[in-house]
Amino acid sequence: MMFEFYMAELLRHRWGRLRLYRFPGSVLTDYRILKNYAKTLKGAAA
């Protein structure tokens, strides 16, 4: 339970920080952020 909360907060913080440097409100930007983050998680697990 605590791990999921931590990961959600980490993702929320990272997402907010990344959006500062990109065009806000863009769905494609959100998709790119999530896709790249998923890649880093997959690489860390391997």
From Swiss-Prot:
The organism's place on the tree of life at top rank: Viruses
InterPro entries the record matches: YlcG-like
Family annotation (NCBIfam families): YlcG_phage_expr
Family of the protein in this entry: To E.coli ylcG.
Name of the protein: Uncharacterized protein in rusA 3'region
